[in-house]
Amino acid sequence: MEAEHTSTKGVPEAGEFLLLDKPLDWTSFDVVAKIRNTYKRGGLKRKVGHSGTLDPKATGLLILATGRKTKEIASLEGLDKEYLAVIKLGARTASHDVETPETDHTPAGHITLAMVRAAALAFVGPRLQQPPMHSASWHEGKRLYALARKGEEVKERKAKEIVIHQFEVTHMQGPLVYCRLLVSKGSYIRVIADELGMALGVGAYLAGLRRTAVGPYRVEDAMSVEDARARILSQIAVDEQQPGGVLAQHEREGSRALDSAAGNAEHDREEARIADNNREDRSRQHADR
């Protein structure tokens, strides 16, 4: 599913929304950088941004905006999100997911599917949710994840209201609970997993997560990063061969001039931006988990 654009050339000059399937262990900014560099490889400069950060250990739908469409990213932020989650019972972790070691092991063999479904049903509706310590939320001018790295814990973290529209437990396999959730903007699925474990009295953490939808946009309509790169380069190649591809030609000429003037300084700035954003992403900046 792609946004409409006004260009009649191969490369949409007004920009577009790209629906991508984020791979495991990639940060959201890894994806943005890859697409941005693809345009650059084709000789075009394009703004590229994304809506709704996914943690490195999550996969699924990541919506990118290019060109003028980056100004419309805010229109996507408030959309509900759907996830498929795997929750492991019988242990907790400091980050509420697989990023930190298991602690507080508790036997969970007595927990039945009916018990989990009953507990999950109680979560449906509006509720207050505290951000996890391993998150980019602020406390007295400092990121929570920065405090967590120092071994500090803020007990009274500012909670915000979220809505869990649906919490469907599909099946269990040993200590693993498989479920589908539809939640409002800003919901941390890993916090829901931790709270479910507490409600069952055995502890739990998020063992796997895949985002399947953002509002009306679905992962079934998404492309892989490599397919998106191939499509962009193909569009640029077609545009180069068209008499009407004047805009792209001017962009390429301007791009080469700017690159020549900027030289290594631009390269260094880009590398620094990638490094900084990777650190932020891996610390769950604006994470929806």
Swiss-Prot record:
Belongs to the pseudouridine synthase TruB family. Type 1 subfamily. One of its GO terms (molecular function) is tRNA pseudouridine(55) synthase activity. GO terms for biological process: mRNA pseudouridine synthesis; tRNA pseudouridine synthesis. Responsible for synthesis of pseudouridine from uracil-55 in the psi GC loop of transfer RNAs. Residues 265-289 have a biased composition (Basic and acidic residues). InterPro entries: PsdUridine_synth_cat_dom_sf, PsdUridine_synth_N, tRNA_psdUridine_synth_TruB, TruB_C. It comes from Chlorobium luteolum (strain DSM 273 / BCRC 81028 / 2530) (Pelodictyon luteolum). It catalyses: uridine(55) in tRNA = pseudouridine(55) in tRNA. Residues 243-289 are annotated as: Disordered. The gene is truB. PANTHER family: PSEUDOURIDYLATE SYNTHASE TRUB1 (PTHR13767:SF2), TRNA-PSEUDOURIDINE SYNTHASE (PTHR13767). NCBIfam families: TruB. The active site is at D55 (nucleophile). Its EC number is 5.4.99.25. This is tRNA pseudouridine synthase B. Pfam families: TruB_C_2, TruB_N. Keywords: Isomerase, tRNA processing.
